[in-house]
Amino acid sequence: MKIVGITDIHGEHNEDFYKYLKENDIDLVLVAGDITDFGPLDFVKEFMDKLYDCDVEVFAIPGNCDPAGICNAIRDAGSLCLHNNLIGFGNTVIMGYGGSNPTPFNTPGETSDDHIYESVYELLAEYDYIGNDTKPTVTILLTHAPPYNTKVDELPDGTHVGSQGVKKPIHEFQPNINICGHIHEARAIDKIGETTVVNPGMLKDGHCVLIDIDDETAEYDVNIIEF
């Protein structure tokens, strides 16, 4: 199974990305927020339709720059809004939480780190409680905000601006993979314990993350791909 993660679309198409999807037999696209640039919401359906033309499933969460109504727009476009939710897909379990910790810009999708921590903790704890002893499973946490003090939340001047509310439950539950975004310049792969954390950067810059999962063993590779 092949899963692609993208982030920070900001209302701009990338035709090379659609071409990549059509040429590489991708099963699922995970969208880590900021689909729009403070709107308009009409772009969501336009964007999702382009993805569906590539014969993929799509799950998405909002970013801090997406306006109120974004989850309804995602659903109306025929996609799953994974914000504050979890779902099984093949031999993966994917959990999602959108928005970001506070920024200097007072954007629509901001919330406190305490609230992010409580919400992400509950998602990871819910899966941990359910458990799965019958077959190998890959756990993916999809967030817009990156975990604090990592390669994926670092501004060019070296300041770390990610979310403690994302980082703390990752430490506690160790999901296999965290896909995030938000900090456009921080395209990188890092580790928090056993968790692989990846920020593929803005879609328009021509990168995505590819997760290639063995259907039988659930062994996986995580790579940032240039298209």
Name these PLM-found stretches:
Residues F17-Y20, E46-K50, S119, G162-P169, ...:
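A general structural detector for well-ordered alpha-helical segments in enzyme core domains, enriched
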Residues M1-V4, L86-G96, T134-I140, K191-T196, ...:
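Beta-strand-turn-beta hairpins that frame and shape the catalytic cleft
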Residues V222-F227:
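Short, solvent-exposed aromatic-acidic interface loops
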Residues H10-D16, T36-L41, N64-C71, I87, ...:
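Active-site environment of divalent metal-dependent phosphoester hydrolases
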